[in-house]
Amino acid sequence: VCMNSTAGTTKAVVDKLREKGVKAGLLKLRMFRPFPAEEIAEALSHLKALAVLDKADSLNAAGGALFEDVTSAMYVNKKQVPMVNYVYGIGGRDTTEKQLESVYSDLAEIVQSGNLGEPYRYLGLRKGEN
């Protein structure tokens, strides 16, 4: 799940993964308010794991703004799917296809192992910045 221009890059990654036979998808949110909670919960309810990409970090321990709303939408609509939040573009850094491919690799690992691990993650940090 993501918004804005990152969805275009993510769509390119999804297309490449699908060509390789990987079950991958993208839900691009076109508007944030009013938040389409019921529609999102229904669209995501069949997934085995999902990632929510946030452009901005949040000053809490629960995740970015989009992640919080997606999590709430799933909870209120009684849909349970393992979810992780990725904050990207820290410091104005570009988000690459390779970084987005790693998100899908992480999701495959979550599905295979059943272990969510750290639910709040960062994309594109330099080594030693995690």
Where do the protein language model's features map onto the residues?
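Redox- and metal-dependent alpha/beta enzyme cores, enriched for Fe-S-associated oxidoreductases
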Residues: V1-V22, F35-E42
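Flexible loop/turn segments at secondary-structure boundaries
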Residues: T6-T9, R33-P36, S58-N60, G91-R93
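Secondary-structure transition/capping motifs at alpha-helix termini
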Residues: K16-G25, V76-Q80
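An N-terminal assembly and electron-transfer interface module characteristic of large anaerobic redox
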Residues: R30-E39, Y122-N130
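A structural-propensity feature for long, helix-poor, extended segments
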Residues: E39-N60
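Peripheral docking tails and interdomain loops at the edges
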Residues: D54-N130
